[in-house]
Amino acid sequence: DDDRPGRLDGSYVAGKFGNWIFSLGQQERWWGSGWEGSLILSNNARPVPTFSIDRAVSEPFETKWLNWIGPWRLTTFVGQMEGSRDDYDHPLFWGMRVSARPLDGLEISLERTAQLCGEGRSCTWDDFWNMFSGNDNAGENVDPEDEPGNQLASWDIRWASPIGDWNYA
């Protein structure tokens, strides 16, 4: 508990540019196909204040080489977490989710989140690139104490049955 008179949870301000939505706010996110649980992001914890970029309308690529992916969606965000932590105060929290519907009723998604930077840790574009590309994983020429962040990755598949009103996740 704290002495704050109010919270901004669930609020945001957004603008649209082409097929992209840019927003600032504290939006709850539920990443995963399950209705009762999510492996990577859920509304179990309070939302982090973030800057987000989302694809507004899910449409297939126009090129014949990528059209088979079907309608696709991308969302990414970055925000700064709170201080007074046991690890590093004020780390950045980054996430990205890409989903596609190659067939009617079938959705495939890939998700990734990472905590990086924070007080007392390096925070450069190289650090972000090493995290994004997987070059910073412990055991990959990086000692655990030098690993610049904590990462999670997930994938999920959701299929809506053409018979009845059944969904499988």
Residue locations for each model-derived region?
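Aromatic-lined, polymer-binding surfaces characteristic
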Residues: 22, 27-50
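Short acidic, glycine/Ser/Thr-rich loop/turn "cap" segments at secondary-structure junctions
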Residues: 7-8, 32-39, 80-83
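Phosphate/oxyanion-binding active-site loops and adjacent basic polyanion-contact surfaces
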Residues: 2-5, 9, 42-49, 146-153
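Beta-barrel outer-membrane channel/assembly domains of diderm bacteria
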Residues: 1-26, 52-55
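Signature for the C-terminal beta-barrel architecture of outer-membrane proteins
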Residues: 30, 50-169
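Short secondary-structure boundary/capping segments
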Residues: 5, 39-40, 90-95
